[in-house]
Design a protein with these regions (language model features):
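N-proximal low-complexity "stem/linker" segments adjacent to membrane-targeting elements
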Residues: 1-33
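A conserved acidic beta->alpha catalytic loop
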Residues: 31, 46-55, 73-75
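Short beta-strand/loop segment that forms part of the nucleotide-sugar
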Residues: 39-48, 68-73, 97-98
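Membrane-interface aromatic/basic loop that binds lipid-linked glycans or pyrophosphate carriers
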Residues: 119, 279-370
Length: 370
């Protein structure tokens, strides 16, 4: 079928949210149109861009009728993505951020894997990517978001794949069956000014999926040198808290006993709160902790911050934060956050909790409870 003809019954709908990305969107669309899998539609949701993005989109749409531009007033990522979900006609849905680049053959690999395993979700890895300029060379680092224990398997995440809940959301290195998303009412948070909505979407997918397939291949280049990325924004201090409130609202609106998933969500919340804390300025860190600490304390009092689910290091960090935020801040400033291994864990437990915390962990393990 010629790529110049509008796909009437696409196998896959690719959602591409666009806002002021004139520097990057051309490379993004080129990578999609170069795929050897051709039966797709590209829904490009223009969120009221004020730069030259719209003109670039028109050029591409005039050359390839698989590209459909959806214009809307600027109202944020969540509303844009939900608009795309509502208008998608494909059996499956992929997400491609407008500053990223899809790997060759990625769309075919995702689609064929989904069909082979009758999967609701297919998830793969990706590259961290710096495109380079006149002063720096292009480089890419492979990022393994899929745990080794899940590669090549068909998994029900809530039963035999809990590790995936704690990985970087990366909703764009995946393929989702459209009727699965609609049946489970999986959408994005639409609150004006919201951010990091990928975390909530990611949680809802893993909490709902009965058949998720995980592959080792990297599926796209995730741009790291876009200075306007929301991850780099020092503002939006409390957006991560809003996103977690939405995850809990969605979960508790579903039938069934959610105690275990609420504990999983508790660990996710603490991890995401630490990530948010680390990216903020000193002044904003204080402001954030003034709200985050009571929120975490409420979860602790509900029994949702479970030591066995969180692990000894994170649980000791949590106890330090809730007991003495000032000590937590001093320790976190001194300790390297990228250290790993048994010795690093011992150092972290000692730094945050002292010898008493380390003794507790050792006696728990020697007693066979861990």
């Amino acid at each position: 079928m010629s790529s110049a003809n509008r796909v009437t019954t696409p196998d896959t709908s690719v959602l591409i949210p666009v806002y002021n990305v004139e520097r990057y969107v051309g490379a993004c669309l080129d990578s999609l149109l170069a795929q050897d899998f051709t039966n797709f539609e590209a829904l490009v949701i223009n969120d009221g861009s004020t730069d030259g993005s719209r003109a670039i989109l028109e050029q591409y749409a005039s050359r390839d009728k698989r590209i459909r531009i959806i214009d809307k007033p600027n109202s944020g990522y969540g509303i844009s993505m939900n608009r795309g979900l509502a208008e998608a006609r494909g059996t499956y849905i992929a997400i491609l951020e407008s500053d990223d680049v899809m790997a060759q053959g990625a769309l075919r690999l995702l689609y064929e894997t989904a069909c082979e395993h009758n999967a609701e979700v297919v998830k793969g890895n990706f590259w961290l990517w710096w495109s380079g300029n006149e002063d720096t060379a292009e480089r890419a680092e492979l990022f393994h978001v899929v745990p080794d224990s899940l590669i090549g398997k068909v998994v029900t995440p809530t039963v035999n794949g809990l590790d995936i809940f704690y990985q970087k959301p990366s909703i764009w290195s995946a393929l989702y069956r459209a009727d699965f998303l609609r049946q489970e009412r999986i959408q994005f948070l639409e609150t004006p000014g919201a951010s990091y909505q990928d975390a909530g979407f990611n949680f809802k997918v893993w909490a709902s999926a009965q058949r998720a397939v995980f592959i080792d291949e990297p599926l796209l280049k995730y741009r790291q040198d876009n200075e306007t990325s929301s991850v780099r924004s020092p503002g939006k201090v409390f957006c991560v808290m809003d996103e977690h409130a939405e995850m809990r609202r969605w979960l508790e609106a579903r039938p069934g006993d959610h105690r275990m998933l609420l504990k999983v969500l508790g660990r996710m919340k603490f991890n995401n709160y630490l990530w948010n804390y680390d990216r903020l300025s000193d002044e904003l860190r204080t402001t954030f902790l003034e709200r985050a600490c009571p929120d975490l304390a409420a979860d602790r009092d509900e029994g949702l911050l479970d030591e066995q689910i969180m692990g000894p290091v994170k649980f000791t960090e949590l106890q330090c934060l809730l007991t003495s935020p000032e000590r937590f801040r001093r320790v976190r400033e001194k300790l390297p956050q990228d250290a790993s291994g048994g010795l690093a864990s011992v150092r972290q437990i000692l730094a945050y909790g002292g010898i008493g915390a380390l003794w507790h962990v050792l006696t728990e393990r020697l007693g066979g409870r861990r």
